[in-house]
C-alpha cells in the first residue's frame, strides 16, 4: 500500500522537475537570444492579446516597433531611470534598501501596496512572466533577473525595457507611444514628453498620457526635477547607457 501511495507523489515530483528544467532551458535560451536579437513579443503582450481574443476583440493587435537605443531620445532612458530605478547603473538587479522600505510600508498600509521592482526586474517580468504577486512568480522573477543581469549589459536591459514597456492599452514600446501620443519618432522626444510617458508607467491602463490627470502632471514635474538632479544627459553618457 505504501508503494502505491508514494508512486504518484514520485511521478508528480519528477514531472514538476522536468517542467522546471524545460522552463529553465527555454528562459535561458531566451535570455541568450535576446541579448543580441530584437524582442518580437513579450509575455505581457501575449497576455493582453489572449485576453482581448477571449473578450471578442479580434481586431486587437499587441505589438511593438523595435528601435535601437541610438533611435531613442536620451531623455526617455533618463526619464524611466529617474521615475522607476535611480540606482539602475549601480545594482545587480535588486535595490535592497528600496525593497526593505517597501516591505515596511506595506506592513503599515495593507490597502496601499508599494512596489520596489528595479528596471531589471520589470524587464524580466514583462518579457517572460505573467501578472501577479504570488511567491512562485516572484521567485521566478528573481532568477530571471539574475540571468539578465549576468548576460546583458545595462544598456541592453534599458533598450529591451523601453521596447516592451506598456504605455497604454495596446501601446507597447516607446516608438509606438511616441507615434501615438506625440506624432513623432522616439528619437525626437523632448524632456517633458519623455517625463510624461514615464509618469504613466506605474499603471498605464489607468493613467493616460493623452489625457493626463493632475496626479500624472504632478508626477511628470517630479520626474523632470529628478532628471535634472541626476545630471541630465551626462548621466546617460557617464554610465554608458546611450
UniProtKB/Swiss-Prot annotation:
The chain crosses the membrane at residues 19-39. It comes from the Bacteria. Belongs to the glycosyltransferase 51 family. It catalyses: [GlcNAc-(1->4)-Mur2Ac(oyl-L-Ala-gamma-D-Glu-L-Lys-D-Ala-D-Ala)](n)-di-trans,octa-cis-undecaprenyl diphosphate + beta-D-GlcNAc-(1->4)-Mur2Ac(oyl-L-Ala-gamma-D-Glu-L-Lys-D-Ala-D-Ala)-di-trans,octa-cis-undecaprenyl diphosphate = [GlcNAc-(1->4)-Mur2Ac(oyl-L-Ala-gamma-D-Glu-L-Lys-D-Ala-D-Ala)](n+1)-di-trans,octa-cis-undecaprenyl diphosphate + di-trans,octa-cis-undecaprenyl diphosphate + H(+). One of its GO terms (biological process) is regulation of cell shape. This is Biosynthetic peptidoglycan transglycosylase. GO terms for molecular function: pentosyltransferase activity; peptidoglycan glycosyltransferase activity. Pfam families: Transgly. Its EC number is 2.4.99.28. Pathway: Cell wall biogenesis; peptidoglycan biosynthesis. It comes from Salmonella typhi. It is a single-pass membrane protein. It is an enzyme of class 2 (transferase). Keywords: Cell inner membrane, Cell membrane, Cell shape, Cell wall biogenesis/degradation, Glycosyltransferase, Membrane, Peptidoglycan synthesis, Transferase, Transmembrane, Transmembrane helix. Peptidoglycan polymerase that catalyzes glycan chain elongation from lipid-linked precursors. It is found in: Cell inner membrane.
Amino acid at each position: 500500500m505504501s508503494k502505491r501511495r508514494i508512486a504518484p507523489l514520485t511521478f508528480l515530483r519528477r514531472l514538476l522537475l522536468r517542467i522546471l528544467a524545460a522552463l529553465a532551458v527555454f528562459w535561458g535560451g531566451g535570455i541568450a537570444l535576446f541579448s543580441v536579437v530584437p524582442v518580437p513579443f513579450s509575455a505581457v503582450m501575449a497576455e493582453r492579446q489572449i485576453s482581448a481574443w477571449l473578450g471578442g476583440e479580434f481586431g486587437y493587435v499587441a505589438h511593438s516597433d523595435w528601435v535601437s537605443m541610438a533611435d531613442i531620445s536620451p531623455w526617455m532612458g533618463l526619464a524611466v531611470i529617474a521615475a522607476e530605478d535611480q540606482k539602475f547603473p549601480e545594482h545587480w538587479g535588486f535595490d535592497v534598501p528600496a525593497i526593505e522600505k517597501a516591505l515596511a510600508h506595506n506592513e503599515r498600509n495593507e490597502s496601499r501596496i508599494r512596489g520596489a521592482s528595479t528596471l531589471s526586474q520589470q524587464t524580466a517580468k514583462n518579457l517572460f512572466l505573467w501578472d501577479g504577486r504570488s511567491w512562485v512568480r516572484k521567485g521566478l522573477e528573481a532568477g530571471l533577473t539574475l540571468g539578465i543581469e549576468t548576460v546583458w549589459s545595462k544598456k541592453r536591459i534599458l533598450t529591451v525595457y523601453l521596447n516592451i514597456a506598456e504605455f497604454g492599452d495596446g501601446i507597447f514600446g516607446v516608438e509606438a507611444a511616441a507615434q501615438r501620443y506625440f506624432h513623432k519618432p522616439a528619437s525626437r522626444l523632448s524632456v517633458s514628453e519623455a517625463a510624461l510617458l514615464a509618469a504613466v508607467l506605474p499603471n498605464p491602463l489607468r493613467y493616460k498620457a493623452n489625457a493626463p490627470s493632475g496626479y500624472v502632471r504632478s508626477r511628470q514635474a517630479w520626474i523632470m526635477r529628478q532628471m535634472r538632479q541626476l545630471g541630465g544627459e551626462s548621466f546617460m553618457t557617464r554610465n554608458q547607457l546611450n
